[in-house]
């Protein structure tokens, strides 16, 4: 079972699905904002601005899930009860991802976001294929389509940037840890 595969059809209702979707989107917003703050701290304003833009896009996804949730009472799900196999939701960009570096380029930020969005697509695709109820499959397909649109957007953005040159992370005067 992959990290993005729902566990044992644990999402059995629309309400459970929407609670998971809301958690995924909120975690993505928080992670992008955290990454933007880190890039600002390290005087990397271009990448910080990109992460802020990604957070804004994810906030639109939160709004979409909230709209879908109208009329539903969403359950509280403890962090260890989510239907993904990792400590982070499938859509959250990993804070420990390869390429996460204070001197990272926009290319890295977009590639990181693209990987996270593809994991979100995979999560919803699997759920749409495994769910026992048609209403859950329908919402999973809708959420998957939203994530696919984000993947397409990010692929377009990535095409505008060249991979950074070899040695991009070398710093003649690296920051020192503070005690």
Give residue ranges: language-model regions.
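Iron-associated oxidoreductase/ferritin-like identity signal
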Residues: 1-179
């Amino acid at each position: 079972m992959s990290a993005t595969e729902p566990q044992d059809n644990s999402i059995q209702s629309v309400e459970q699905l929407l609670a998971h979707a809301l958690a995924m989107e909120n975690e993505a917003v928080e992670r992008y904002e955290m990454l933007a703050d880190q890039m600002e701290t390290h005087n990397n304003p271009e990448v910080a601005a990109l992460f802020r833009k990604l957070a804004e896009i994810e906030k639109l996804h939160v709004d979409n899930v909230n709209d879908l949730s109208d009329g539903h009472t969403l359950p509280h799900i403890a962090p260890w009860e989510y239907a993904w196999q990792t400590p982070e939701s499938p859509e959250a960009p990993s804070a420990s991802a390869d390429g996460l570096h204070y001197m990272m380029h926009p290319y890295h930020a977009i590639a990181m976001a693209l990987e996270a969005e593809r994991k979100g697509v995979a999560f919803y695709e699997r759920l749409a294929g495994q769910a026992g109820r048609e209403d859950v499959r329908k919402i999973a397909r809708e959420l998957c389509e939203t994530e696919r649109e984000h993947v397409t957007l990010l692929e377009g953005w990535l095409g505008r940037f060249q991979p950074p040159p070899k040695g991009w992370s070398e710093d003649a005067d690296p920051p020192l840890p503070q005690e």
